Amino acid sequence: MKKIIALMLVLTLVAALAACTQVTRISVENPAEIKLEKAGGGVAVTLTENKTVSRITDVICQIPLQAAEATEDAWTYRITWLDADGKTITTVTLAGSQIRWEGQSYNLGVGVDLSVVTDVLETIPGLNK
């Protein structure tokens, strides 16, 4: 009986740990364009080239995210995906070392550095005036 109780306790702890480390990934279906905004100046750029839209979408959607409490009030970049009709699919905000998506703040998965994403965004013509 003690072995069964111990086994159940171990299984419960494993399940609890798995729930704590649940990874989320951003999902964007069929984007036609991306609107990039940089904080602190109202600068915005709309990207429509399929290759560029796909590349940015792929990079953002591959980042493993873990739900967390917000640690930053200020944001640096906002990325909005639009469909072919110009309607918003979803929006992601980069805030310090976190990503905000669908009303939730997320920490990046282990080994992911948000500066890599911001470095790419810094190279977008017209965004950094």
PLM features: residue spans?
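Function-determining sites in protein domains
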Residues: 20-129
